[in-house]
């Protein structure tokens, strides 16, 4: 246990409403990590969150007539092991779509 060296890890969490845009962003991150000799694990899909909104169709009385809308939040995790300074610089300069929320933990 004492001989094990603590490996440095970067965990990247991605969230988006559009699944295709999320997958393209994951591919860009993994490609960047592979180009800088870091080991990328993922993308690991997490459960999709569904938020349902119930709205009355009529502006006046008809409470029986309702309409349902939903938003789906797709999530992924990517782990990057043994990153170098070059890897971190490349990830900082990476241009990703604005519809993807990125959270990075070291």
Curated annotation (Swiss-Prot):
Q: Which SMART domains match?
A: Ribosomal_S10
User: Out of the domains of life, which is the source?
Assistant: Bacteria
Biological process, per Gene Ontology: translation
Q: Pfam families in the record, alphabetically? A: Ribosomal_S10
Keyword Coiled coil applies: no
A GO CC term attached to the entry: ribosome
Q: Which GO terms describe its molecular function?
A: structural constituent of ribosome; tRNA binding
Per UniProt, the keywords (alphabetical) are: Ribonucleoprotein, Ribosomal protein
Can you state the subunit structure given in the record? Answer: Part of the 30S ribosomal subunit.
Q: Sorted alphabetically, which HAMAP family does this protein's record hold?
A: Ribosomal_uS10
Which family is annotated?
Belongs to the universal ribosomal protein uS10 family.
Q: Which PANTHER family match?
A: 30S RIBOSOMAL PROTEIN S10 FAMILY MEMBER (PTHR11700)
What protein name applies here?
Small ribosomal subunit protein uS10
Q: Which organism is it from?
A: Synechococcus sp. (strain CC9311)
């Amino acid at each position: 246990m004492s001989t094990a060296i603590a490996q440095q890890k970067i965990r990247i969490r991605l969230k988006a409403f559009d699944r295709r845009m999320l997958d393209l962003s994951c591919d860009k991150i993994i490609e960047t990590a592979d180009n800088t000799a870091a080991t990328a694990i993922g993308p690991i899909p997490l459960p999709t969150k569904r938020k349902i909104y119930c709205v009355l169709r009529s502006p006046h009385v008809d409470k029986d007539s309702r309409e349902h809308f939903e938003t789906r939040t797709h999530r992924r995790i990517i782990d990057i092991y043994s990153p170098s300074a070059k890897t971190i610089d490349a990830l900082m300069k990476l241009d990703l779509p604005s519809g993807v929320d990125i959270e990075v933990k070291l």
